[in-house]
């Protein structure tokens, strides 16, 4: 009878009306109300939550510490390669960012009860616990204590610095990230050193808390090698197209070239990876795959299943090559193949942007940085849509495999009321353009005339021209002459009607008319 209740403004289909009614009820102070929670899928910041909650009612934070994408605190600007492989629930130490999240939360709440879904966020649990105990403790001290307690007192500093280095893997292009090999090498050196020393069972190199980063570093090393190889294959797949006369024969050449992406780039490293996975399964029942470790799904921590997927647009190209059989002439087939080759270009005076590329970040216009607001509620975020690259996708029956490219994994997405603005340069001053847009894939806006989103320039809504025939994910708009300024720049804003959770951009083409 003396129990109290904590309530949260979490709701999947949010609206301002719900928010206002929620806090109206909080203000009535029912006798059973003990406090308010701030958690994932609350449509407003903790600061606003505190401002709307009576000051004598405490607020408790429930941060999501276990996910890297489609979550409360995503890894912003994550390379699509990592998103489709490591995925949402891999081993995910983020000490630097999690301490920043805690620092931003602290003024508005009485403490944190982290939302966890298992062992993958093991390091983050200690980062948050230590910060709640004493927020003056540097996160490197927390990592050293963690390593000293659970792995090796002799190597606490080296282990801590190596775990911290995982965050550098999340930044920049996967194919050129030097932190990948650095972490892998450092953990090998530490393993050799600890094997030469004496530890009780379950400590040193035998500690599962050491085997977890060992496995993850091996995974990143393997995926990077695969990504480098697959990129090289795809970069050369259309070589010779302009000179070819027999398009059916050239299509077979493409298939032969793409076949290399189905082969492991390093069998020894792959064997090491799966061996470590088996060790972690035996030690702690870590469900790393659906085939050997009983994960319910690859997206629920079974990320080892992604080790064999091609890390280029091989599936997309193979699906489109099948369309050649329905074309009558060599000229028609060659035109189609050239369209596939050039689909991510915009022609003279134009511009193509995919928000999975590091270069795309230069076009974003935000009032704050992600470091200042990692939850990205009042500012847009980079959101990842990875389902079409899953190892469980049936490439024969999936209706959109011929439209699924790496360029469509990442979106700049504004939830709720976050403005989504991009300033595009390099255009022809004063010229008219056709603007082509792929919206965030998670909303499923494909070929619909009445979607609750649209594009504006200088506050004026652009005229909708329909969708691209054959690829209805692409929406077409008319940018009138005079909107591109004298410096060759124009600012596009993705807007939404009242109701949907958000909007944004995945791909943008600016085609000179």
Residue ranges of model-derived segments:
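Surface-exposed beta-strand edges and their flanking turn/coil or helix-capping segments
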Residues: 20, 50-51, 72-76, 125-127, ...
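Generic structural hydrophobic/aromatic packing signal, biased to beta-strands
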Residues: 7, 36-38, 59-61, 114, ...
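Extracytoplasmic
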Residues: 339-513
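C-terminal non-catalytic alpha-helical accessory regions
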Residues: 116-124, 136-351, 358
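A broadly tuned preference for mixed-charge, low-complexity surface segments
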Residues: 23-27, 90-95, 157-179, 490-498
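Bulky hydrophobic/aromatic packing residues
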Residues: 12-14, 80, 106, 142, ...
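Catalytic-core regions of glycoside hydrolase
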Residues: 1-156, 160-161, 242, 246-312
């Amino acid at each position: 009878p003396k129990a109290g209740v904590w309530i949260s403004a979490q709701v999947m289909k949010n609206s301002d009306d719900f928010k206002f009614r929620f806090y109206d009820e909080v203000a009535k102070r029912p006798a059973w109300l003990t406090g308010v929670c701030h958690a994932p899928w609350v449509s407003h910041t903790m600061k606003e939550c505190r401002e709307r909650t009576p000051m004598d009612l405490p607020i408790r934070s429930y941060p999501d510490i276990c996910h890297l994408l489609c979550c409360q605190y995503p890894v912003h600007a994550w390379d699509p390669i990592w998103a489709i492989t490591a995925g949402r629930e891999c081993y995910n130490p983020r000490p630097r960012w999690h301490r920043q999240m805690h620092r931003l939360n602290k003024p508005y709440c009485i403490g944190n009860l982290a939302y966890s879904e298992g062992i993958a966020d093991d390091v983050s649990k200690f980062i948050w616990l230590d910060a709640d105990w004493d927020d003056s403790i540097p996160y490197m001290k927390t990592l050293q204590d963690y390593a000293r307690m659970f792995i090796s007192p002799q190597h606490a500093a080296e282990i801590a610095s190596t775990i911290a280095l995982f965050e550098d893997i999340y930044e920049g292009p996967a194919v050129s990230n030097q932190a990948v090999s650095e972490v892998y090498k450092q953990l090998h050196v530490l393993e050799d050193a600890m094997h030469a020393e004496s530890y009780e069972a379950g400590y040193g190199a035998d500690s599962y808390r050491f085997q977890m980063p060992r496995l993850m570093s091996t995974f990143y090393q393997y995926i990077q090698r695969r990504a480098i190889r697959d990129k090289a294959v795809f970069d050369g797949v259309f070589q010779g197209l302009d000179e070819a006369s027999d398009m059916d024969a050239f299509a077979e050449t493409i298939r032969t070239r793409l076949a290399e992406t189905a082969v492991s780039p390093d069998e020894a490293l792959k064997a090491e990876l799966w061996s470590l996975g088996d060790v972690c399964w035996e030690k702690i029942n870590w469900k790393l795959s659906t085939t050997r470790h009983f994960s319910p799904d690859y997206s629920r921590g079974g990320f080892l299943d992604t080790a064999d997927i091609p890390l280029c647009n091989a599936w997309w190209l193979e699906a489109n090559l099948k369309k050649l059989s329905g074309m009558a002439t060599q000229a028609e087939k060659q035109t189609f193949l050239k369209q596939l080759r050039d689909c991510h270009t915009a022609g003279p005076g134009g511009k193509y942007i995919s928000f999975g590329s590091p270069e795309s970040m230069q076009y974003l216009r935000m009032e704050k940085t992600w470091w200042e607001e990692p939850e990205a509620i009042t500012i847009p975020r980079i959101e990842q849509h990875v389902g079409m690259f899953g190892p469980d996708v049936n490439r024969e029956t999936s209706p959109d495999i011929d439209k699924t490219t790496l360029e469509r994994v990442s979106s700049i997405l504004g939830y709720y009321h976050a403005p989504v603005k991009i300033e595009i340069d390099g255009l022809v001053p004063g010229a008219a353009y056709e603007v082509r847009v792929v919206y965030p894939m998670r909303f499923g806006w494909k070929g619909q005339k009445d979607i609750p989103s649209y594009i504006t320039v200088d506050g004026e809504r652009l005229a909708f021209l329909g969708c691209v025939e054959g690829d209805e994910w692409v929406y077409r708009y008319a940018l009138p002459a005079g909107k591109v300024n004298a410096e060759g720049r124009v600012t596009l804003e993705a807007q939404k009607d009242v109701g949907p959770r958000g909007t944004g951009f995945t791909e943008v083409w600016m085609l000179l008319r």
